């Protein structure tokens, strides 16, 4: 004899990989050297929306996706399509931002937040920090935004990837 209960939400099993220097999945890595190019592969079984943020481990969070030139504040994902993010070789080459990871100390640890939902959501309110850096906000404001989004959207999923950068 079993019990019946309502499924509130099923996990969306998306696939996100951090790639170092090359745009192929075999170059998945969490260990970077100062100046290495950052790419990310992403695939989802459902249509949805994606945002990617990088926390510098100190006080700032940088919005890597949606791209700076995207005016609508969200990045759309089509189900079962493979995306290589931060690469100029894709269909969105006119709006892509490319990133090199840098370290101001001998060793740094950063967190990459990969945020996906089948429901439309808008990126956090952030500020432009100049041409060399992506838009940013402080860590406390980012956490407040993320908690608010997750409370409103039970289907939102967040993966955190730890990235080490050495000089």
Regions found by a protein language model. Give the residues of each.
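Secretory-pathway glycoprotein ectodomains that are cysteine- and/or Ser/Thr/Pro-rich
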Residues: 1-167
């Amino acid at each position: 004899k079993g019990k019946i209960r309502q499924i509130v939400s099923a996990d969306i099993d998306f696939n996100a990989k951090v790639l170092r220097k090359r745009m192929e999945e075999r170059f998945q890595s969490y260990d970077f050297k100062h100046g290495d190019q950052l790419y990310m592969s992403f695939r989802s079984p459902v249509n949805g929306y994606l945002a990617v943020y990088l926390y510098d481990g100190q006080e700032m969070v940088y919005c890597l996706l949606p791209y700076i030139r995207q005016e609508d504040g969200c990045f759309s994902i089509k189900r079962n399509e493979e995306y290589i993010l931060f690469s100029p070789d894709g269909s969105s080459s006119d709006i892509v931002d490319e990133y090199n990871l840098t370290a101001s100390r001998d060793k740094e640890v950063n967190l990459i937040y990969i945020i996906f939902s089948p429901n439309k959501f808008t990126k956090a309110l952030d500020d432009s920090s100049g041409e060399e850096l992506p838009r940013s906000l402080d860590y406390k404001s980012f956490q407040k935004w993320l908690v608010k989004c997750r409370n409103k959207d039970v289907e939102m999923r967040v993966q955190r990837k730890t990235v080490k950068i050495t000089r």
